[in-house]
Amino acid sequence: MKDVTKVALLIARAMCASSGTFVFELAFSITEYTGRPLGGGRSKYARRRRAISIARCHRCYRLWPPTVFTTRCDNKHCVPGISYNVRVAQFIDEGVTEVIPSVINKRE
């Protein structure tokens, strides 16, 4: 989770509103131990939708529909090659994660 401190501040603020004490260390440890939210865009449908949006295969990250030069992808039994574009693979698998900058990182 990239915005651990931002989520920890939100949890600490909610704890302060309900109990009256602001304990950031507890909120930070709660945030670290929680994983990615349930779902979170990691379904097969979401992967295929993101791959179609950038005209790539959701399995091997090659161009889809294939051109004359791309013959190894049939979109059913293909696998990633030895050197594939890691940024494209990360976008298809996880979605947009680094586009929105954190407000906390700007102040530091």
Swiss-Prot record:
Q: Where are the zinc fingers (C4-type)?
A: 57-78
Q: What family is this protein classified in? A: Belongs to the carlaviruses nucleic acid-binding protein family.
Signal peptide region: none
Keywords of the record? DNA-binding, Host-virus interaction, Inhibition of host innate immune response by virus, Metal-binding, Suppressor of RNA silencing, Viral immunoevasion, Zinc, Zinc-finger
Region of interest (Basic), ranges: 47-50
Function (record text): Suppressor of viral-induced RNA silencing. Increases the accumulation of viral RNA and enhances viral cell-to-cell movement by inhibiting RNA silencing.
Transmembrane feature ranges: none
Q: What is this protein called?
A: RNA silencing suppressor
Write one Gene Ontology MF term.
Answer: zinc ion binding
Q: A Gene Ontology biological process annotation?
A: symbiont-mediated suppression of host innate immune response
Identify the taxonomic lineage of the organism of origin: Viruses, Riboviria, Orthornavirae, Kitrinoviricota, Alsuviricetes
